[in-house]
Structure formats: C-alpha cells, structure tokens
C-alpha cells in the first residue's frame, strides 16, 4: 500500500477499524481546514512580468494558488479539478490570462502522486479545462510561445515506476486540442526541463533524463540515454550537446540549465554525474562547455535539485538551487549562500521577473517565498495550508488533539480548537519526530506522544527520547522511512511497531518483544513491471520488504492484521 498524502489535515479522522454507521449521524458535519499553515514541497513558481504583484504557485499535492499582493496572501484556484498534484505552471507571455498547468509532481521519489495531463485557463485561473496528455503522469516543465499562446511545449517524464511510451517532448499548436510527440528516445527516458532561447523561439533546449524509481526505496538516477539536446527548427529535429559535458561513460544523470536573457549564447548548467559532475558554462549557445565549479553544495543531489537561473540583465549573475540557494556575480567562478527568509531548505524552482529582476520567487520544500528587493527581505510561507501529511491520529483529551507527520517539516500536532476559536500557525507544535512519522498518542496520558522510529515526546517538558528497540541497531531488521506505529484499541498499554517483524511493548518502550516471524517474502525481487531498466542500485538496495500497514481489532486483543509492501497480508488470532 502506498502512502496517502493529504493536502489538508481533516478534523475528522476515519480509522481503519471504524464500523459502518448511518449517514444521518454525520451528514450535517462540515469539514474545515485546520492547517498546518507552513507549506510543504512546492515546485511550480511563476509570475506575470507586467503585473509584478501577481504570482502563481504549484504545490506537489496542494493544487494551484494565486497571490495578488506579493505573496502576503494566497488563494486556491484549482480545487475543483480532479488532481492536486502539480509539477509546473506557465503563463502566456503575450496574454497573461492564458495559463497552462502540468500535473504530476515532476520529481523522482519513492513517494509521489501522479497527475493526469495538462490543464488550461483562459480567464486568469477562474475556470479550467483539461487539454490532454493524461498518461504522461509526471510533467517536469511546460513553456508557452512568446507571441502565440496556442503553441506550447511539454517536458514529460512519464510513469515514475515503470516504462511507458508517454515520455519526451510534446507540442501543441492549437492550444491543447491536439498534441504531437516531437522528441522521444525510449520507454525509460523522459524530459524534465525545456526552455526557449529568449530571443528566438525556434531554438529550444531540453534535458532528457533516463531514470526510474524502483519499488521500495531503490532507484536509478542515471542511464545511457541522458543528455542535453537542442533544436533550431521549432522542435522538429534535435541534436545532443556533448562537447565538454559528461556522458554515459561518466554516469550522466539529470541536467538543469539556465539561459541568459541579455546574452542568449551564455548558458549555465548544473550537471549530476558520477564522474565530472558540477556547474558548467557555455558561451556559444551550447556548442561547447567548460566545468567552472565542482563544489558539491551547488550540484550534489542533482536528481532532486537542478535549478539554475541567470539574472535577466546581467549574464554574470547566476543563482542555483540545491539544499540551499547560492549566488555568483562573476560568471560562476565563486558562490555564496543566498537564502530566502525565514530559511528552509531544498530550493526547487526560482522565477525572476525579467522586467523587474529584484522581484524573485522561490519554490522550496516549505512553500513559496517572494522578495521584491533582490533578497533583502522575503514574504512568509506560514500562510499556505498546502502541506503533505503522512498519517493522521487523534488523542482522547478535550478538546482533542490532531497529529501527523508533515513532509519536510517533521511530526506536528495541534488542538482541534484554538484558544481564540480559529486555529493559526501559532497553534501547531513540533512533537519531536520525523516528517514521515506515524504518530501514536498515549491513550492513558495525552502528554506522551510516540512517533516515527521511535521517539517519545513529552508535551509538558518538551523533551524527546528515543525508545526504539535496541535490537534495531544490529542491522538485522529492515526499516523504511514510514512504518506503522499504533496503540492496540483493545489494550491501551500495548504499542505495536512494524519493521519486517512486528514488535510489541507494554511499558512505553522500556522493553520490546517480537511477536511475529518475518512476514515478508524471502526474495523480494525487482518486479517485472520495472521493465528492462534494472540497475545495480535496484538489485542491491537493502531497505526493502517491510510491514507497511497494521490494524488491530477493537474487540479482540489477540487479533492483529499486518500487510507488507511486497504484497502479503497476515492475520494472527493469538
């Protein structure tokens, strides 16, 4: 069973053990958003150059939001659409009322939500229509022709967990009524970034990336067919740019690139490769490249981060996004940290207003943040209820508290009713566990919260303590980033925790015992659905085959169900 990712925490949590009840008992209840109001991963970021106060952000599982006051407030404009997973947003330069949205997270991860194609608005985001490419599933980037809003190019990543034909570069010339695949390599190689030459829309660049997310936590971030390509005839034909860049022999993976508006022959690239990775520069429109910086802080983890942008009016000023953001003012020779307040990490996307370059928009793991003065001050991201939540739990106190693991921010909790009625970002607290945590409040003591793998948090003292089984340190037992943790509903003293075996403690983690054998397959091989693209990483990754779901009977303390991530379901009655 895959993770369920929630855009909002819901006040009412329906547990797996809930009995069927009459709708008459709850039909008058209404959902309300209670946060959290610190956002999670955001990768779509764009503004309108001629309307410098207007911005659009695309959230991995939160849809599309619009701000008309430089990020002070955000309003959802995509809630009535069938997907909340967004990879990119593009506004037509010639008619800013025309907006295209590419769905799917546009990332490479073991836990993501796929999309169902491209959406279009012709009224500034008030209404939307679906315009195709359903089975691309992951759209990394889309761009709109500078003078013709009906011409759009899409960089399609394709299926994240297996091969498919819907990968590569797609083009429409009629506003999305029909699409043509204009560049395709194979069933495992997708496109993740595409850009126009700023002065000639007949010239395009695209990064083709051969990669695949395997089952469990194992993945391949490079393949023989990855590379940077260029078209000079509007996308009809393409050639690979290789002079000076790493290739298949060097384990080339993802390439992120930026083009100078003021000097289109100047390109920068952040190149992820097992050998010779780094920041590269071209001064002849990509025909040749030079390695100018090897500092891994700038390009490391290139499968996750590959953002590099050039100042619109100065080709020597360049920004790159990685775990942190960095800036260079000497053509990429030297760099220093350039962060958006209030901090945060994992900088996925940067949009710079081409007419007012002091206006910049970062999309990061904590949401959207905007500066209007070149980075001196930034807007808050504590106004964006777009978080990705792993699991939801409630306790027994009054008013009851709601807990969960928030992507990129750790495990958190809040009372279901604020002191002033409305719940704000100030009401949420960290509870000392990780972002993927299943959270288990103690049924007998609401001040004790268990979470993750496994921390015990005391709300009164604010202290956290690791109470995981000591035997886990031996390396004998398998764990993934999110694992089941729950109190047995028929025995408030019994805390259950799943690895590849099921653990039980009756005293808050002071002593643990194993109550099951290994419930997973002996040989969890890579499934045939992965296709021919099997790499050493996929075959040798150790963290696979765990108990992924546990449910206990509220009527019988001896009855427990367990499901594994390699497709098995078990039950015990003793």
Where in the sequence are the language-model features?
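N-terminal signal peptide c-region/cleavage motif recognized by signal peptidases
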Residues: 13-15
């Amino acid at each position: 069973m895959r993770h369920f990712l929630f855009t909002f925490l819901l006040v009412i949590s329906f547990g797996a053990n809930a009995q069927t009840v009459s709708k008459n008992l709850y039909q008058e209840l209404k959902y309300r958003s209670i946060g959290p109001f610190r956002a999670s991963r955001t990768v779509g970021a764009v503004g309108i150059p001629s309307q410098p106060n207007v911005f659009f952000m695309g959230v991995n599982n939160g849809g599309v939001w619009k701000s008309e006051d430089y990020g002070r407030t955000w309003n959802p404009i995509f809630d009535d659409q069938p997907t909340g997973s967004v990879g990119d947003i593009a506004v037509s330069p010639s008619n800013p009322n025309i907006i295209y949205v590419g769905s799917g997270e546009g990332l490479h991860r073991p836990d993501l939500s796929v999309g169902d194609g491209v959406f279009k608005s012709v009224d500034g985001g008030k209404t939307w229509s679906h315009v195709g490419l359903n089975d691309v599933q992951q759209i990394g980037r889309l761009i709109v022709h500078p003078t013709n809003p009906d011409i759009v190019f899409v960089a399609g990543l394709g299926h994240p967990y297996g091969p498919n034909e819907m990968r590569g570069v797609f083009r429409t010339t009629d506003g999305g009524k029909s699409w043509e695949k204009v560049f395709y390599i194979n069933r495992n190689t997708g496109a993740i970034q595409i850009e126009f030459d700023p002065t000639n829309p007949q010239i395009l660049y695209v990064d083709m990336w051969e990669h695949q997310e395997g089952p469990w936590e194992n993945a391949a971030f490079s393949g023989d067919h990855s590379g940077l390509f260029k078209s000079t005839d509007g996308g009809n034909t393409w050639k690979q740019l290789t002079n000076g860049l790493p290739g298949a022999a060097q384990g080339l993976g993802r390439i992120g690139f930026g083009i100078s508006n003021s000097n289109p022959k100047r390109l920068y690239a952040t190149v992820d490769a097992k050998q010779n990775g780094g920041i590269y520069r071209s001064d002849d429109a990509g025909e040749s490249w030079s390695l100018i910086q090897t500092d891994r802080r700038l390009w490391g983890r290139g499968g996750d981060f590959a953002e590099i942008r050039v100042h619109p009016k100065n080709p020597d000023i360049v920004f790159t996004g990685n775990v942190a953001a960095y800036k260079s003012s000497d053509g990429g020779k030297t760099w220093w940290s350039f962060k958006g307040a209030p901090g945060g990490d994992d900088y996925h996307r940067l949009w710079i207003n081409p007419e007012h370059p002091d206006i910049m928009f970062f999309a990061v793991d904590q949401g959207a943040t905007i500066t209007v003065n070149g980075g001196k001050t930034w807007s808050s991201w504590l106004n964006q209820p777009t978080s990705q939540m792993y699991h939801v739990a409630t306790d027994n106190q009054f008013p009851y508290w709601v807990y969960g693991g928030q992507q990129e921010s750790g495990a958190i909790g809040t009372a279901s009713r604020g002191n002033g009625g409305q719940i704000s970002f100030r009401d949420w607290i960290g509870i000392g566990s990780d972002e993927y945590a299943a959270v288990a409040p103690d049924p007998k003591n609401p001040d004790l919260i268990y979470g993750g793998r496994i921390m015990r948090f005391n709300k009164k003292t604010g202290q956290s303590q690791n109470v995981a089984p000591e035997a886990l340190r031996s390396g004998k037992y398998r764990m993934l980033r999110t694992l089941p943790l729950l109190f047995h509903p028929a025995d408030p003293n019994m805390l259950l925790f799943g690895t590849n075996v099921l653990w039980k403690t009756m005293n808050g983690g002071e002593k643990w015992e194993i109550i099951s054998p290994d419930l997973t397959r002996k040989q969890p091989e890579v499934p045939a659905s992965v296709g021919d693209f099997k790499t050493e990483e996929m075959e040798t990754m150790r963290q696979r085959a765990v108990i992924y779901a546990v449910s206990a009977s509220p009527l019988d303390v001896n009855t427990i169900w367990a499901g594994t991530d390699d497709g098995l379901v078990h039950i015990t009655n003793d």
